[in-house]
Amino acid sequence: MVKDSDEIYMKRCLQLALMAEGNTFPNPMVGAVIVHRGKIIGEGYHHKAGLPHAEPNAIYSVKDQSLLKDSTLYVSLEPCSHYGKTPPCAKLIIDKQIPRVVIACLDPNPLVSGRGVKMLQEAGIEVKTGVLESEARRLNRRFITFQEKHRPYVILKWAQTADGFIDIAREDIGSGPIKISNGVTKTLNHQLRSTEGAIMVATRTALLDNPHLTTSKWSGNNPVRVVLDRRGIIPETNKIFDNRATTLVFTTKEGAEKHLIQRSNYLNQNKIKSIPETDKDLFFEKGNGIKKLFENDNIEYITIDFETNIVKQILDNLYHYNIQSVIIEGGSMWLNTVINSGLWDEARIETSKSIINTGIKAPFIDGIEIKSEIIGDNIIRILAPKK
């Protein structure tokens, strides 16, 4: 087949894969198409972790299985070669005697990482790789970053006025920020949350905005909520502690001790059972280990050193917590800290036409614009780091 037709069928694989966005964690999104003499005879995609992969879904969708011996299988990610929750896809392809396989990109997972291709080639199957590779890697940027860089994919996100401010200067706790996003972009922000592993804010944002950080405006999974609280000053009545989603608090030993007392009082009032005192002691001996302080509670505390490489410490902990992506929403100082660390992958900046003349300056970022979209009176720009 000519290159153009290979790309056409691979585009369809990517379209299929995207249908499961937000549902396949911790697995990547994968789509597969089977073509016989220029006609698509089978399609499939991976719906959810633990369910069949894209390749068997496509293979078993073919009504006349005898046609597989004269067909090409297109798949957006290298077929797996190991036994996990499902059997290896490479073995099924071999068993079905499919003579040609076209792959967009290799799987960076060490359990696969070229082994699927090798297995197919050793069985005499013609294998072609690298068709729409950059598009396929972009689709699974969270999974690939997690596997290759051993940290979550980091998305910076904020809304700013036309004159470069993200908010007015304010001190009233719970007063909420000025309105910059419009109704549509607010909904899209919640849609984004449903596709990412975690969402993070710093102490001041949690105090002043008192945000839920959930997907209340979109039907989907809530991300893990992450908050910085060095001194343990965020009250237990804050919405971020409402148990609607797992919440990780990065703090110090002193901050954790404060939360321990405050949380104990709060949960006892709400008749939630406290864990044994010995387990609480273990937490403090363990240092920066992730530990729940109470039974039936979704709040967990992680102690870190706030004086050294704070961004890396947080990302390392999120990696060990198996979080593949995180949205960092604020505040401006924390966003600038992450930007200056160089440990970010994407910035989503919404700009309105409003002008406020003074307030909290938006973060400074120097990146490459990869996409922009006008939504109502606002424009959303997506930036990537300069290489």
Segments from the language model and where they lie:
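Hydrophobic, well-ordered secondary-structure segments
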Residues: 117, 133, 137-140, 186-193
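Enzymes that bind and transform nitrogen-containing heteroaromatic metabolites
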Residues: 2-27, 43, 62-63, 153-387
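N-terminal glycine-rich anion-binding loops that anchor highly charged ligand groups
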Residues: 24-38
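Flexible, polar/acidic helix-loop-strand segments at domain edges
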Residues: 140-151
